[in-house]
Swiss-Prot record:
GO terms for biological process: protein modification process. Belongs to the NrdI family. This is Protein NrdI. Probably involved in ribonucleotide reductase function. The lineage of its organism: Bacteria, Pseudomonadati, Pseudomonadota, Gammaproteobacteria, Enterobacterales. Gene3D superfamilies: 3.40.50.360. It comes from the Bacteria. PANTHER family: PROTEIN NRDI (PTHR37297:SF1). NCBIfam families: nrdI. GO terms for molecular function: FMN binding. Signal peptide: none annotated. InterPro entries: Flavoprotein-like_sf (IPR029039), RNR_Ib_NrdI_bac (IPR020852), RNR_NrdI (IPR004465).
Length: 136
């Protein structure tokens, strides 16, 4: 299986989801001066911001991470979190990233996710990487 990369704000909702998921993952730092470089294909897990609009939906740290061509070349899919209070824009960072990076939007969950979300994502991530391996 390949990597998961995620960003979590100081609310730690996405971080708690990733801990419960229990799969190897790398966190994009909160401090914008700290940078990471990913050397293997990965699925990005990202929260949505902005109160419901597309503008500002993707966290700055994630934009900076994806603006690094090395990192952008290795993204294979995106999973987004958000708040259902945002209506149609719920989890919209996933839509924005999928469209801009040309990768599938695999799943979305609310806030910290439910146990059902954890089970679905764990199974889905494993199946996604199996399919990627077969088609490579």
């Amino acid at each position: 299986m390949s990597a998961l990369v995620y960003f979590s704000s100081s609310s730690e909702n996405t971080h708690r989801f990733m801990q419960r998921l229990g799969l190897p993952a790398t966190r994009i730092p909160l401090n914008e001066r700290e940078r990471i470089r990913v050397d293997e294909p990965y699925i990005l897990v990202v929260p949505s911001y902005g109160g419901g609009g597309m503008a500002g939906a993707v966290p700055r740290q994630v934009i900076r991470f994806l603006n690094d061509e090395h990192n952008r070349a290795r993204i294979r899919g995106v999973i987004a979190s958000g708040n259902r209070n945002f209506g149609d824009a719920w989890g919209c960072a996933g839509d924005v990233i999928a469209q801009k990076c040309g990768v599938p939007w695999l799943y979305r969950f609310e806030l910290m996710g439910t146990q059902r979300d954890i089970d679905h994502v764990r199974k889905g991530v494993n199946e996604f990487w199996r399919q990627q391996t077969r088609s490579a």
